[in-house]
UniProtKB/Swiss-Prot annotation:
Gene Ontology MF terms in the entry: cobalt-precorrin-5B C1-methyltransferase activity
Naturally occurring in which organism (per UniProt): Desulfotalea psychrophila (strain LSv54 / DSM 12343)
Reactions listed under catalytic activity: Co-precorrin-5B + S-adenosyl-L-methionine = Co-precorrin-6A + S-adenosyl-L-homocysteine
Protein name: Cobalt-precorrin-5B C(1)-methyltransferase
Stored InterPro entries: CbiD, CbiD_sf
UniProt keyword annotation of Iron-sulfur present: no
A Pfam family of this chain: CbiD
SUPFAM superfamilies registered for this protein in UniProt: CbiD-like
EC id: 2.1.1.195
Length: 362
């Protein structure tokens, strides 16, 4: 039987690239009175890409495009990104002067409220590379003889609603989404995007003067840790599966103490010193986990059950049924030892169950 064909995951465009495209389109509309159906803009790597645009009725020189994030599960995929070009307008709290234009954050674009990010507090949450892309795209449309400074306002009508599905509130970005991107391209399920978010969370925590960082594998694990820890919201970062990176990053940024909260499958992977805990990067080897538990003192009858288990949760159930809290503790100690070796900091381990309860602390 032939194997089923699996097409490669499709890349898409960042909100920053979309914002640059509609900014150029709005500038053309303002200058010529004609709305372009398509524009081509430069990307940071020197390549050029085309975007389909639509004029927005009754809003002046305003153009829009629908963000296509490809096969990446991006919350902004399918969102309408708008830009309005004008010569008028007073400076407001969400505007910033660039070299050639004045850039403003409109409805649905967040505003930075905390230190530690690449954008200063009070400015629109439009990151440095998107700002450069917007200015470069607009420059291609501006007349060389035009001396007045152009105002570009970026808006995302669904931005406030979409922001609730992001970590923006924790980063100190209020009232909307961020306009993001470093290359203009969205890579499906991008590791670099995950890591950048983790690092940004840690930067915000350090800028707030925090000495302790809580890294968790997901929202359930984070909720469990919050039951024991009296720390501000900025101290928490969901690292997903990027365990080794998060430990190294927390160590590099100088936190004195790291709290690692995870469910059993993730904790036992840490005990096995698996640096990236997603199932596609080394599915939990039941045999390896069972071998570790055997080494730690599981008896013959228990080992039979452990080696026959299909999942990590099933293994934990066997340990609980047999009253082997000592083995659970030993696994957490191994995970702690690994985490402290990687981070070179003091690490506390919190084993969380599916009800967001802490069932062991080390």
């Amino acid at each position: 039987m032939s194997k089923a064909y699996k097409r490669p995951l499709r890349s898409g465009y960042t909100t920053g690239a979309c914002a640059a495209a509609v900014a150029k389109g709005a500038t053309i509309l303002l200058l010529s009175g004609e709305a372009p159906e398509k524009v081509e803009i430069p990307f940071p790597d020197g390549s050029r890409h085309s975007f389909c645009l639509s004029q927005q009725d009754g809003t002046g020189a305003c153009m829009g495009t629908i963000k296509d994030a490809g096969d990446d599960p991006d919350v902004t995929n399918g969102a309408l990104i708008l830009a309005t070009a004008s010569w008028e307008g007073e400076d407001g709290p969400t505007c910033v002067h660039l070299t050639e234009i004045r850039l403003c954050g409109g409805d649905g674009v967040g505003q930075v409220s905390k230190r530690g990010l690449s954008i200063a507090p009070g400015e629109p949450a439009i990151n440095p590379v998107p700002r450069q892309m917007i200015e470069a795209a607009v420059a291609e449309a501006l007349s060389q003889h035009e001396k007045r400074k152009l105002t570009i306002t970026i808006s995302v009508p669904q931005g406030l609603e979409l922001a609730e599905k992001t970590l923006n509130h924790r980063l100190g970005i209020v009232n909307g989404i961020s306009i993001l991107g470093t290359t203009g391209i969205v890579r499906p399920i991008s590791a670099s995007a995950w890591k950048a978010t983790i690092s940004a969370c840690m930067d915000v925590a350090r800028s707030a003067g925090l000495e302790q960082m809580v890294i968790s594998t997901g929202r359930t694990s984070e909720k469990g840790a919050q039951q024991l820890l009296d720390l501000p919201e900025e101290a928490y970062a969901m690292m997903g599966d990027y365990l080794q990176f998060s430990l190294e990053e927390a160590g590099r940024k100088g936190f004195s103490t790291i709290h690692y909260a995870g469910m059993w499958a993730k904790i036992i992977k840490a005990a096995l010193e698996v640096p990236q805990t997603h199932v596609r990067n080394g599915a939990l080897e039941v045999e390896a986990a069972a071998q570790l538990l055997k080494k730690l003192g599981a008896d013959e009858e228990l080992c039979k059950k452990l080696f026959a288990a299909n999942t990590a949760r099933e293994m934990l159930s066997h340990l609980e049924d047999e009253g082997r809290d000592d083995l659970v503790k030993a696994v957490c100690q191994y995970a702690k030892k690994y985490a402290e070796k990687i981070s070179e900091k003091t690490v506390h381990i919190y084993l969380i169950n599916h009800r967001a309860e802490v069932i062991h602390y080390e």
